[in-house]
Each structure stands twice: as structure tokens, then as C-alpha cells.
Amino acid sequence: MVEWSIFNEIFAVAFNVLYFVIIIGTIFIVILDNRNPVKTMAWVLVLFFLPIVGLVFYFFFGRSTRKEKLISKKGFTRLIKRPMAEYQAQKAFKCPDEQYQLMRFFRKVNNALPFEGNATEVFTDGYSMLYSLMKEISKAKHHIHLQFYIFEDDPAGRLLRDLLIDKARQGVEVRLLYDDVGCWKVPHAFFDEMRGAGIEARSFLKVRFPLFTSKVNYRNHRKIVVIDGRVAYTGGMNIALRYMKGFPWGIWRDTHIKIEGKAVYGLQTAFLTDWYVVDRTLITSSRYFPEVGIFGKALIQIVTSDPVGEWRDIMQGLLIAISSSRKYFYIQTPYLLPTEPILMALKTAALAGVDVRIMIPARADTWITHLGSLSYLDDIMRAGVRIYLYQKGFLHSKLMVSDDILSTVGSTNMDFRSFEHNFEVNAFMYDPSSALLLKGIFLQDQKDAILLQRKTWIKRPWYQKAQESIVRLLAPLL
């Protein structure tokens, strides 16, 4: 009995020492990673005050992959051979002087090729987007490439799935990428039925316990469809019935665009790069980059960002865009958890006299991110930023427009997760027509929103302020 007691004591001491070494070692690794100090401190606090939970969360969500590469430089050069030839063959296009720096930045760090002669169509509801998408898919002759964060097994998902199966049986190549976490609850049989019909369906960065758990944090949030290399779609909408029907308490308001023209090359490149990541097959045939004519006047640059690149491409581009704005900068985002550079840029622009407006939903789909968003409002309103709370339903739109010349629509939210952890894609449009159209959409939505008054906001209950402040500490981790 005495020997057993001594053994228990020795085991307890050894366990505590090992546990202490692991926690301190993990904190040391976090510090040595030289990340953003705010994010580093958030992880240190979690590991220190909630060691067991913090250790599990760090193992799942905290490890950085910024020094890895998705595709070799040689492979990427082969992939963009045709788009590069088309880009170099363009006559000198006109880019507004104010936006040239932004375009050059994306060209240098993101290999994003700007193309003129594009036409766009904007969708603000799921019904019109899905109808247009299925109409174009029905015309497909050679290939259909689809990529979504969420592809639900519901009436909307099954409707699109059945059409894709029909096209595959007609001999059209169909490739589908879906995010493994975003589609976690979708039955395997749903995608297996597609595979049985000849559709190549792959999940992005599979999460299988206990292996590869660190992949949970790095998700593919992109929404891309490319049909025959001639028409493409991107924006904020996934494939699920709620994107059309909304919630019992309101509509689902989103923004998606259809692109015709050579800018489609950029979305094709993004899809094929991600396809290479999961399938290890590099698809470079010119059939996926056909000759494309002139469809309109829009100058468009497709920009991607990911958690493995050296730079935070889209976030840094937005910093340039905000800093370059002279008259106004309007933003729609479902989640407002900005990084410190973005936060400072917004406040600086407003203090310099730029009309900065941010629209977020009055009611969100997740309470914790909504509390985090609310924690930033007083700070930015004090600098003169106008905050609008959308009342008609859930605002999921990721839209930005500035000075009647620059606009962007895509999958990127104004939060740490989109800027740091997700694979994202946005279409940046240097075009007055596109900017004015999206500005009009923002102003129309403004009629269904209330302008938040700071003098009223600061009087909210102390316990709400406390909740917001606590959640804000975790903002870099959400």
C-alpha cells in the first residue's frame, strides 16, 4: 500500500513536470514564431490561463504554415503560360493613377494578371445567382470547375448535383472542390453519388483524426465556378438553401458576380492551383484557357490569398486601397474583426476626411463573432467612421467600393480568419461602371439599415461591454 502511494506521488510529480514543460515549450514556440504581437499575446493568454484547453486549441488551430508552398515556381509558370501570353499581348491599358500602385502590388506579390474587356453581372440574392449558374452550366461543352466552402445536401445542393451528373454523363469534364470542414456534416453518400457518375469530387485538406489535425485551421473559403474557360462566378455565396430562403427572422443578403472575359483566366488559375494541392495533378492544357473575346470594358484583376504565402496579399491590398481613397470608402462585411493595420487605416482615412462607411448585420449567424464585431464599433466611430446595422436579415455580403472607380467582390471577410488563415479570392475591378453599380447596391441596402449613433451606443449595458471586451481578446483566434 505504501509502495503504491509512493508510486502515485512520483507519477503525479512526473506528470506535472511534463505538463509544465509542454505548456512552457508551446508558449516558447508561439513567441519564437514572430507573429503579430496581438495574436501571439492572445495565444499566450489562452495557454497560460486555460492550459489544457489552450494546448488542444493550439494543436488544432494555432500552428503556422506560412513558410510552406502550395506549388513550385516552375509548376505555376507552366500553369499561367497561356494567361501570361494573353496579358503580354494586351495593348497598354488605362489604369487610374490612384489605383496603379494597388494593381502593381497585386501583380508583383500575387502574380495577379489584370485584363481589360470584361463584362460583369452582379447578384444580390441566391435565387438569381443559382438560376444564372445552372443556365450557364447547362451550356457547358468541355469542362465545369466548381469550388465551394459549403455544398449542402439540401434541395439547392441536390438540384445542382443532379445537373452536374447529367453534364458528366454527356461527356463534360466536371471537377468539384469542397472544403472538408465546411462540408463536415454532409453525408459521404452525397459526394459519392457524384463520383459514381464520373464527377471528380475532392475535399480540400482532409481532416482525419488524430493525423493532420493542424489542417483544421486552414480552410478553403473560396467560391469559384469556371465553365469552359469562358465564364466564371465568384463572391460570397455557397450552395445551400439558406442562401436563397434566409432565416425565419430575415432574408440572406449576399453579393456574387459573373465574369465574362479574360479575367476568367485568373479564377481558372486559382481553381487549378487548388486542384493541384489536393490531387497532385497539374492541368495546363490550353483547352482550359481558350481564346476569349471582348465582352465589355471592365479592367479586372483576380487576387487570391492563403495561409502559406509569404504575404497577406488581399489584406495588404486593402491597406493600399483604403489609404489611397480620397472621397469615400464603403464596406459590407458580415464579420468586423479587423487586424490592427486595417483598423488603423480605416480610422486614419476617416480622420483625414474620407467618408468611411461600414455595414454589418444587426443580427448575425454566430453570436461570438458578432460580439467581437461589436467591440470595435466605439473605437472606429470615435474616428468618424459611420456604422450601419442591416435590419432586413443577415448581411453576408463582402463588398467594397471607393471613389466611383475601385470596387471588389469576393469571399474575403474583414476579419483575422480571412486575412490570416483562409484561402480566399476576390475580383478587384478598376472600372467606373462596376463601382457605381456596387455603390448603388450599398446605398440601397443603406435604406434597410440604421445608422448607429455613438452617443446611444456608449450607453449600452456594462455587461454587454464586458462580453464584447472578453471576446475581443480572442479575435485573432476566431
Placement of each model-derived feature along the sequence:
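Active-site donor-binding acidic/aromatic loop of nucleotide-activated sugar
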Residues: 387-391
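Catalytic-core elements of nucleic-acid end-processing and repair enzymes
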Residues: 398
